[in-house]
Each structure stands twice: as structure tokens, then as C-alpha cells.
């Protein structure tokens, strides 16, 4: 895994170093801190404003950070700990003008199981991510070739998740149509189509294309 962030501007490098400090201050159990997503791929967007489906939107890429621990924490505990890290990171910053940090967390055992089972989200992180901190006490697993039963189980899991998500968007679109909110209806229809499409892609390939931009503001629909 890569370790250098020298391709990023100095301010971004300072932000990431501060994020590492903030996590380690509140989480002694931390084993690895990994930058993934658009900042790891150097495809990030600092700020972009556009109009999509009649809605004015502003986009800013997040710092996507995977925190790996030796312990499997209960969800509310690790969320509380990482909230402290987030608050400490924003001290002295204009929170609304700063790049947002988004944490996800996994225990080293769960992360290695996910990599071993070829879960694309985690294998992509291993392939494209940047190791910001490593205690040196653990190693990441290697993905392996799955047998037919494992492939079938994973395909069914992905299909059910994405297809139901698409159904939710479609239901929202129908509500919007009934309320004559046609612009937001078109947005929900687009999301439904995208998830129906991805449910097919995931079922047959066990992989989904990357798309990660954070919506930081939605104003009223434009005329």
C-alpha cells in the first residue's frame, strides 16, 4: 500500500497529519489509518457548484478515512470516540469552509475477512489507499479466489441490497410525482435507475464503479 501524500498541496497534507494526530489522541487501540477515495486517487474536487435536475448543488470531496482497530467496538462507542476526533480536528477551523472528514472503522479481523472474501470496497481501499499511520503490529490480508458458493452468496447479497435501495428511490419518486414536485422526482428517478443498473453490474461482476462526491448543500430548485 502507498504511504506518500506528497502529491497533495501543503494544506491538504497538514490536514491529513492533523487528522492522524486527532485519532491517535482518542483511540489508543488504533492500528492503521488509511486514506481512501478521491483524495487517495488524486481525483478530488475542492469545490464545484452546478445545477442538476433543476436543483442547485455544491460539491466538495471529503477526506475519506478508514480507521482500523485491534478491538471490535460496539457501534455507539466507536462513533462517540471518532466524534471526539472530528471535533478536535475542526478546532480553530471554519467547519463549513473546511474539507469534511468522514470516518469509517473496522476491526483488523473484520477488515482482513472482507479483503479475503474479495469485497470490492475493501480490496479497492487496499489497492488504491494510502497508509497514513501503521502500528506495525498487523498485516493486511490478500484477496483469494472465491468458490462458486461464495460467489453466489456475495452476488445475492449485493443484488438484494442495491435492488431494495432502488425500490426506495422509486417509491420516493412516486410520492414526489403525486405532490407535483417534478424536479426532485426526476432526481429520485435517476437514483432509482442508477441503483437498478448497479444491482445488475454487481450481481454479474461483484464490482461497482466508483462515484464519491459529497453533497454539502442543496438550495431551492431553480426555475
Question: Could you say what each language-model-derived stretch is?
Answer:
Residues 31-45, 49-52:
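Short gly/ser-rich loop at a beta-strand->alpha-helix junction or flexible surface loop bordering the NTP-binding
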Residues 214-223:
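Residue-level detector of conserved catalytic or cofactor/ligand-binding positions
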Residues 2-11, 88-171:
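Conserved NTP/Mg2+-binding pocket subregion across the NTase superfamily
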Residues 185-207:
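Hydrophobic alpha-helical packing segments in soluble, helical-rich domains
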Residues 2-26, 46, 52-115:
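Metal-dependent nucleotidyltransferase catalytic core
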